[in-house]
Structure formats: C-alpha cells, structure tokens
C-alpha cells in the first residue's frame, strides 16, 4: 500500500502518466457479474486500500506506482459495440479495476460512449464510483431498464477521506 502523509492537511500531488492505447477486447467475462468493461487501465482516484493496485500494476507493465498512470483505451466504445453484437445478454460491470468516472473521463468520455453502446443493446449495467461526474450521464442512466449505480462513501471526515481516496470527489460534492 502507498504511504500516507504524516500531516492529514498535506495535499498529495502526483505526476500522472497518461497513455492513449487501442484495445483488442473490452467486454470480458467476470466472476462477479457476467461481464466487465474497463475503458481505462489505472486510476486517478488512487484509493490506498484498492484491491486493483495489488495486481493491476503487474499486468499493465507500468513502472509508475498505482495512481500515477492511466492507459486510455481510445477505441473502447467501438470495440464494445462489435463485441456486444455477439455477446449473450448479461450484466456488465463498469469498471472492475478503476473508477469509470475518474477525472480523465471528463475529457475522454469513454464511459459515456460505452454506456451508449450498452443502452442501444439494453444490457443491464452495474456502476460503482466515488465521483460526482456520474451525474453528467443521468440522461443515459435513466434510459436503462436495468441499472445499478453505487457510490462509496468511506468516511464522513473529509481529511481522512483525502488520505485514503485522494482523487475521489469530496463528500460535500
């Protein structure tokens, strides 16, 4: 796990390495839901306790610590659209190893564009996030027949929250 700052008021600044990549596959079998979709590898939210930080770095090939890199799978929506044509209907978890609404999503809109593909085929969706950016997509989310959107709030103390989830939206947001 990443070390915590000694002073809870200390702001953590990290350099973020962003790499735009192309995905061969985006709709993958999951042991939790039927499928998972991860338009990003890496996560700016950088939760200190996240299970993904323990194994994703090994699979990503990055030398940077977890929370300091994000690979943006630029063709995620297009690849997903093709895969959905052949897929058996099932619940899709967006995203199993990152927050689908991490700050870069505001620029790239990959989660939003993937949601459009899933909506067109009416696949059930499950989203877990710590970001207020999910509100941007309410127009799409309300169109699904089957959808779950969960928000994780670890603590009501903003200072402690920033220690453990430095890139998450504030509790007030």
Residue locations for each model-derived region?
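The canonical Cys-X-X-Cys-His
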Residues: 47-50
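N-terminal [4Fe-4S]-dependent radical SAM core
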Residues: 9-43, 53-91
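Intrinsic disorder/low-complexity segments
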Residues: 4-8
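Conserved AdoMet/S-adenosylmethionine-binding subsite of the radical SAM
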Residues: 75-173
């Amino acid at each position: 796990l990443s070390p915590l700052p000694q002073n809870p008021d200390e702001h953590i600044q990290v350099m973020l390495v962003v790499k735009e990549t192309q995905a061969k596959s985006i709709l993958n079998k999951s042991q939790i839901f039927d499928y998972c979709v991860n338009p990003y590898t890496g996560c700016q939210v950088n939760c200190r306790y996240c299970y993904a930080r323990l194994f994703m770095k090994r699979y990503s090939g990055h030398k940077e610590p977890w929370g300091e890199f994000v690979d943006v799978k630029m063709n995620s929506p297009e690849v997903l659209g093709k895969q959905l044509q052949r897929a058996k209907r099932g619940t899709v978890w967006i995203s199993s190893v990152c927050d689908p609404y991490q700050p870069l999503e505001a620029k790239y809109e990959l989660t939003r564009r993937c949601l459009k593909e899933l909506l067109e085929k009416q696949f059930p969706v499950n989203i877990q996030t710590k970001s207020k950016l999910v509100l941007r997509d309410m127009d799409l989310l309300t169109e699904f027949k089957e959808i779950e959107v969960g928000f994780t709030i670890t603590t009501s103390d903003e200072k402690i929250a920033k220690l453990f989830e430095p890139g998450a939206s504030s509790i007030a947001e």
